[in-house]
Amino acid sequence: MPQRRVPRAFSLPWGSGQILEEAGIEGGLHAPALQLLNYELGEKKGQQAIRFAAYSVEGEMEDRPLIINEREFDALRREIDRSPRLKALLRRLVE
């Protein structure tokens, strides 16, 4: 998977800011990625969120739900381990 620079900007209808961390892998037909978003402007200003994204093999974000196959879990877990703030927010989700 091509490395994407972080931090980098994102913009959504309800706010914009920076992608602070990203954990992604090459998944064959797509490249799943989890992104830590930090809102700097808009109605979500000051909040953080996790975006579950799917990229095409060409590196473009796809407009569809992210599906992660269980065979991808170990590789994605290793990438999440390199993103401590994202990992902490995910931990809050599941614990």
Q: Where are each of the predicted segments found?
A:
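Negatively charged, low-complexity tracts enriched in Asp/Glu with abundant Ser/Thr
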Residues: 1-31
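Mixed-charge, Lys/Arg-enriched low-complexity segments
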Residues: 56-95
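A short, structured beta-strand/loop element
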Residues: 30-66
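Intrinsically disordered, low-complexity sequence elements enriched in Ser/Thr/Gly/Pro
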Residues: 2-6, 49, 75
